[in-house]
Amino acid sequence: MITYKKIAELAARFISKPKVLKFGFNISPMYRRTSAKVIYISEDFLKIQIRLPFSYKNANYVNTIFGGSMFSAVDPFPMTQLMNLIGDDYVVWDKAAEIFFRRPAKEDLYAEFIYTEEELEEIKQKAHEQNEFEIVVTTKLTNKDKSIVYCEVRKRVYIANKAFFKEKQKARINKKAK
């Protein structure tokens, strides 16, 4: 089965990876159904911006943006962005999520996903020293000028040294076989 990751890797041979992922998310059925849109990915992939428009497609019973739409609009990015930033020597998985609604939204919402070079170095160092650990990535859905926070999503992301992770999986399989 062809995966989104394989398609992105193939397309990145011809177009910059940020452009491939922006286009890919925006045409992908799994992301299009959120009604959100990726509006910007920096060339270094350290910054991603999305917009979740308020429309009939995501209005709930009381005519505000449905909470599930808010969550699904931001869900894939902390993990996907980090995977692309730290490379194939690491395993990155979503572990858990919390969503906190601050106020009902009746306007377009915006979110940014930002990692710094320093954070990436810390993550790689920690994976080297501890083999596996988790981080919490907080994303705020705001109005365009960021003056009002409508929703905050906290994602717990698992990160592991890939060699360690493979050994851990092998040990788990061997234990079950006994």
Predicted regions and their residues:
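Hydrophobic beta-strand-centered segment that forms part of the acyl-chain substrate-binding groove
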Residues: 81-119
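Short structured motifs
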Residues: 33-38, 95-101, 122-124
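Alpha-helical membrane-targeting segments
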Residues: 1-33, 57
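Catalytic strand-loop segment that frames the active site of acyl-thioester-processing enzymes
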Residues: 33-64
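Residues located in well-ordered beta-strands
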Residues: 37, 98-100, 112-114, 140, ...
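A generic structural signal for short beta-strands and their flanking turns/coil linkers
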Residues: 34, 46-48, 93-97, 107-111, ...
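Hot-dog-fold acyl-thioester-processing enzymes
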Residues: 56-77, 91
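HotDog/MaoC-like acyl-thioester-processing domains
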Residues: 2-15, 105, 116-178
